């Protein structure tokens, strides 16, 4: 389960290969020359049995089991990520995915001001298990381009929530055209029925006048870089009378501005925010004790209200990258790592967190300054996508890693300066998928693969 540049070996699940992978795992963020690939750890008694969906460097949406074996693919779906849909949202049919169907090259047409040569989504859509298109969006979008990025969600009424970019001029900004973030509600025909534009609500996001001035004078046209958009979903806060958490309200986060916010779907107003200004993370062990007030979040991803029925339901779960962000950029620890935070959204207390130290490693052993995700699982584990290194894992509430997988399908290329072969294992986002969301009879296996303390360098 290793790859060696310039050649990558196929991921074969063998004890020796797994051991080599584990020996390298602590170095993953430093970019070792021998890279672990495939499943490197599995405790079937404590891991939640599931499939996992991700889009690798080979541009295939790939469904794997916990042994790391591919059970299904949807080829040629380049883009940010793929999402397998809850059958309850697609008339009980299993195995439908949201994917990017078609990209266009942004060079020369100024689709993304301030960036060189990006790929921009022209069309996104829904594919069934047989890879047939069941829904699409793009032709009826502005300029005939979906410009979807980062996130999307199928809604209970059959519509689709889409996070997109909108290139336009906005008065008061230094940039002639900004790359705005826009939320669309798209119906079954691909028509936009509702939209929300971020630049129209900057004054509602908690920025000081000085911060608003920095944003408007920024050289970065992608000034907010919203990377997450989800409906709140049913929750006990709303049931108790707190209208801010209405199930159809929307939660999003801005990576560049260190803000998490909730939008009232009916009024369009921002009704709840976390950030952009936080106290510093306490030094030493005080920064690991919970509960405590929320402290400095920076460059975060995948903010969501934990769904009803799961452990921690109603709390906010977020991958806190601790990447450079903020207006102005916030101070960050020189040798720090990333965190997964569970936050009570009303008291604004951190009630649980995960760092590498909870697994007996130095803080920097778990670090992804960009991309990444975290999801709560039915058995109380948390699924984590350490996106920068392409490492996926399940961790218990006590910090035990009970399943671990490293992307075996990196993006291969050539260095523009040296001409040497390159491999990039990063995964923007991966999704844990319940076994019964795939068609009946889809094969899966969960075979124990145990790491010894001598192999990991950390007690388990």
Language-model features: where?
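N-terminal secretory signal peptides that target proteins for export/translocation
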Residues: 1-12
